[in-house]
Amino acid sequence: MTPPAEQGAGPARVPLRERENTTLELTATGLAALAFVVVAAVALPVFRLEAAPISGPGSVGQYAAVAAAVAAALAFAAGRYALHTRSRPRMGGVLDVVDVAALALAHGIIALLGWTLAAAIMAEAFIGATVFALPVLAVSGAAAAVSAYIAFLSAVNMGPQLLAVVLATFLVGGVLASALTASDPEWWMQNLSTLGISDDLSARAFNITLVIAGFLVTVLARVATRELPTATAGGQRRVLGALVLVGVFLGCVGIFNVDTRFWIHTAVASGMVVAFGVLTIRLRAWVPGISRAFLPVGWAFLAIIVVLAAFFAAGYYSLTAVELVAGVLVFTWIILFQRNVGALDADTARGGAA
């Protein structure tokens, strides 16, 4: 029988340095291991090998959430730098650096909110329980490791569609956390912006969430329209402008509080809806290649927002309900828009290659 080596050359082994995906996966695993070791080591002097509560001040949940946030932010920055060294894509200006910083912060906050919520749920499941010394080290290290791993892979695979998901996750998590920790339990009887009018940590978190989310929308707009296929002359610029306006107005909602700058706050909130409406109505003219089946989705969302606003004016619905539904519809549309643009881009590239 002929030895396997003599039957054919077989597939050539690719050197590790040329296996980019494998290298990135190994790097993510290495960063996760590093985060585990560092966070577990820091937990030694923090908890002094003593038991700790699951959630609340001085708890393993609080420590793990903060450590995971730092690990996620640093890992995301490391992932973008890894792509930068491979010129895929290369950061070429201040805006690119600011984009990376904002996205790293968003990943850190998502990790912070996620682990805080997980700890709160576990505390409700195990009422009165404490975590022993060694599990404290293991749990906190594991939380940081998982967060670093996910954030690094998110950074190296970041695209318009994933960025839209990150934006939605960040915005929903921030608003939900503010609502759960609001000093006024009846805030919803007034409007959503009431979450940002007090001086407590919950209000600051709400306003910061809106500002960062607004900036992320502008980042998303730049990324999504950079190579928008089949856009007419000037269409790409107009789509970019409309999305940027949505982001800027969203950030301004967090900057100008409803209790101190009512008219400015109302103007920018209304402007966000107007910009969204213009974009959905004019999208077909600006991007002729966009799916015809997608266009009625935007029109329907806009019609629902207008009807809800009319119901609020007539006294049937509260402003909170209108704001929540409008926010969900706008950002759902943005996510769907990114997916349709991605599909259009792929089809255009396939058609050009054929």
Region spans (language model):
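A loop-to-helix transmembrane entry motif
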Residues: 203-210, 260-274
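Membrane-helix boundary elements
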Residues: 58-60, 224-229, 238-265
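Membrane-interface helix-loop-helix junctions at boundaries between adjacent transmembrane segments
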Residues: 90-182, 187-201
